[in-house]
Every structure is written in structure tokens, then in C-alpha cells.
């Protein structure tokens, strides 16, 4: 069974792509107050503006209202993935190939969890 975040991803991703955005990540916090957090990036490399976030938020809100996945009231937060974004999809690694990254591991590797360069 899919989580709420996965279900939301499935129903909004195509619409965001059509709008020119990559859906980077969806998080759902199911405790009161419930929060749907959506991180986006531009497919064409442009910076994400507040207007972009507003338009995406309106689109997602309309879709979620129709699909009725979340019982009770919730807050919807849409933002840019930012410069320190987490790479969560395989395609992201190719997109940022050749750029400097800081890698933070969950487990020790050679006695370290942080590799700044």
C-alpha cells in the first residue's frame, strides 16, 4: 500500500511537469496540524519565484480537493528545493554531474559521515 506522500506524488507529478516544473519531493506530516510539503525545481533551469510557488500551490490544492486523499484540514507548503537540495531521484545525479557536492552519509564510511568535497 502506498503512503499518502506517494499517492500525492502520483496524482500531481504530471500536472507539474506540464507546468514546467520537476516534482522533487513530497512529504506528508500526518500529525495535527497535517502538512503537505512539496519541493519543486524548474525543468528549464530558471530560478523558482514566489509566483511559481503560488501557481503550483493553487494547482496542487485543486487536484487534492478533487481527489480527497487527506481527511480533515491540512496545510500545503510549496517551495523551491533550494541550493542545498537533497538528491532523491536517480535523474538528479546526471543533472548535477560535474558540480561540487557535499555528501552526508547515514552510516560511517572510513570513519566519516561527511565528505565536503
Curated annotation (Swiss-Prot):
GO biological process, one term: translation
Cellular localization per UniProt: Cytoplasm
Keywords, alphabetical: Cytoplasm, Ribosome biogenesis
A Pfam cross-reference name: RimP_N
Domain of life: Bacteria
InterPro entries cross-referenced by the UniProt entry: Ribosome_maturation_RimP, RimP_N, RimP_N_sf
Principal location class: cytoplasm
Keyword Cytoplasm: yes
Annotated GO CC locations: cytosol
The keyword Cytoplasm is assigned to this record: yes
Function: Required for maturation of 30S ribosomal subunits.
Family that this chain belongs to: Belongs to the RimP family.
PANTHER family: RIBOSOME MATURATION FACTOR RIMP (PTHR33867:SF1)
Family annotation (HAMAP family): RimP (MF_01077)
Name used for this protein in its record: Ribosome maturation factor RimP
Gene: rimP
Amino acid at each position: 500500500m502506498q503512503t499518502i506522500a506517494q499517492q500525492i506524488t502520483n496524482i500531481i507529478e504530471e500536472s507539474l511537469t506540464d507546468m514546467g516544473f520537476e516534482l522533487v519531493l513530497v512529504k506528508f506530516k500526518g500529525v495535527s496540524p497535517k502538512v503537505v510539503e512539496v519541493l519543486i525545481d524548474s525543468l528549464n533551469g530558471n530560478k523558482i519565484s514566489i509566483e511559481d510557488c503560488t501557481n503550483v500551490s493553487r494547482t496542487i490544492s485543486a487536484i487534492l480537493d478533487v481527489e480527497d486523499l487527506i481527511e480533515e484540514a491540512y496545510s500545503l507548503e510549496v517551495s523551491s528545493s533550494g541550493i542545498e537540495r537533497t538528491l532523491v531521484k536517480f535523474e538528479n545525479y546526471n543533472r548535477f554531474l560535474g558540480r561540487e557536492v557535499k555528501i552526508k552519509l547515514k552510516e560511517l564510511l572510513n570513519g566519516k559521515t561527511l565528505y565536503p568535497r
